Amino acid sequence: MLQDNPLLAQLKQQLHSQTPRAEGVVKATEKGFGFLEVDAQKSYFIPPPQMKKVMHGDRVTAVIHTQKDRETAEPEELIEPFLTRFVGKVHKKDDRLSIVPDHPLLKDAIPCRADRNCEHDFKEGDWAVAQMRRHPLKGDRGFYADLTHFITYSDDHFVPWWVTLARHNLEKEAPNGVATEMLDEGLERRDLTALNFVTIDSASTQDMDDALYVEEGADGKLHLTVAIADPTAWIAEGSKLDDSAKVRAFTNYLPGFNIPMLPRELSDDLCSLRPNQIRPVLACRMTIAADGTIEDDIEFFAATIESKAKLAYDDVSNWLEGAGNWKPESEAIAQQITLLQRVCLSRGEWRKTHALVFKDRPDYRFVLGEKGEVLDIVAEPRRIANRIVEESMIAANICAARVLRDKLGFGIYNVHTGFDPANTEALAALLKTHDVHVDPQEVLTLEGFCKLRRELDAQPSGFLDSRIRRFQSYAEISTEPGPHFGLGLEAYATWTSPIRKYGDMVNHRLLKAIVKGETIARPQDEATVQMAERRRLNRMAERDVGDWLYARFLSDKAGTDTRFAAEIIDISRGGMRVRLVENGAVAFIPAPFLHAVRDELVCSQENGSVQIKGETVYKVTDVIDVNIAEVRMETRSIIARPVV
């Protein structure tokens, strides 16, 4: 009788509209309760029974109840689920399947079944890709998922790689396809096979995409020719291979192996600038003045070359530093190395004065056994040979940026605008507290940004530099020429790695059109969106595999007295993140490990410091000694504590 009563319906509606509600993101804890985080300042407690309706990371609206001055949230409507497609570990009990998502804050098993299109017979411990199908806030009784893909068995030694690639939905192997013959591009190729081109790479590199040759003019100026592998001589625009490269966008470099953008036959053989093999190239010749300036007579052209030597970074560096037994196999190669060093030093000086030079950080290389076990992690400092290649590539990319801008007005550019305009007042205020004075408008110009960077680089520590990082904008990929503040350059367009970057292949096609005097269409903006997204995913995959391998490598150090020097890289309310100097692993030091009395401890992300009883004890960029307290394999996290 009452159910159709309009007055009752109206009353219900009124009550509903008067009940306070909030929208936010669910944050789970390990103790069963959770919080609805509305913004940085406001959060509501979610009791354990209500947490059963939601999952960590869900965006929901909730009814806010007030009892005895305590506010609690009752999740009511799902706005955006945290889990849609995910990876996890399968459990099997009495022929019933469930899956535990591979996420540090998701511990509960979700009932599931194998999807119709997935024919694998799932066993306990298998890794799988799953798709959420049911959610309590959608009116379902509980959570439920379908297993859509089998990833691998629990005892596979390469679980870190396969699970990570599946998580980010990235390819596991090289693309299929062959290129049987070179295209007729109507390009005249200069025969440079007699010149002493050399490649300098890691000893294990197979996909050599750059070769260098220098000669000195009578006036003492250096003429550098950068020859770059030419995959677009084999791959037609719009072909199957081109489409697959466009999707992959980059070769994916993971610890231990890579997944190439192009078929290996091309990347490691036909296009690779192997020694004593004749190869087609796209080349750039530039004149470098005594002070390192690149003069205006930049020339791009097609050619064939024959690399005369595959040199390794360490050998070249040792020889130039007068160490080790290696020496160049001929006087001609020795002369090339010496001239390349001159190019490097003069260009490095020019960039220091007129642009910006990144601080050298070592690369960390995982040494793996046949079963994926980590035998060692080696810090490889950037030495003179690395800098020779880096300076040559940066010079070549500056040339491409200029030529594309002046001849076409477009290309694939790396653009970085420095600071976000919305942040410059706060930036100036922060710097002022450290006696560094900047004009909020001036730092938005390339010149003003470079001036500030040089001032920060001259500081005794990197502390202030680390404080202003949060005000910086991100680098972008754009079809429009624009400045790259991070490098201190007016424009920057890469073309020197076309075997491993699709954007460089696009720039090759544009440069070839200029060489031939033809018109060509501007690249589509969607292509740059795909490149940026793939770059992000590849970086996350590299980090995820690295975290897994670091956890494996350091697990036997947990609870021991082994000391590691560690640089503080971040401070938050909960503690500090540090990077171990000798191997690059990132570890977390919880606040209770810093000081036992919580009220006497202030961990400030804002100030980048930890204070105990009002005294600053730690700050970002400090290097401290730590022990490994614990390694949690299921979350691949390393917990450290300071050595007292």
Swiss-Prot record:
Its EC number is 3.1.13.1. Residues 561-643 form the S1 motif domain. Keywords: Cytoplasm, Exonuclease, Hydrolase, Nuclease, RNA-binding. Residues 189-516 form the RNB domain. Its main location: cytoplasm. Gene3D superfamilies: 2.40.50.640, Nucleic acid-binding proteins. It catalyses: Exonucleolytic cleavage in the 3'- to 5'-direction to yield nucleoside 5'-phosphates. InterPro entries: CSD, NA-bd_OB-fold, RNase_B_OB_dom, RNase_II, RNase_II/R, RNase_II/R_CS, RNase_II/RNase_R, RNR_Ribonuclease. GO terms for biological process: mRNA catabolic process. It is an enzyme of class 3 (hydrolase). The keyword Cell membrane does not apply. This is Exoribonuclease 2. It comes from Enterobacter sp. (strain 638).
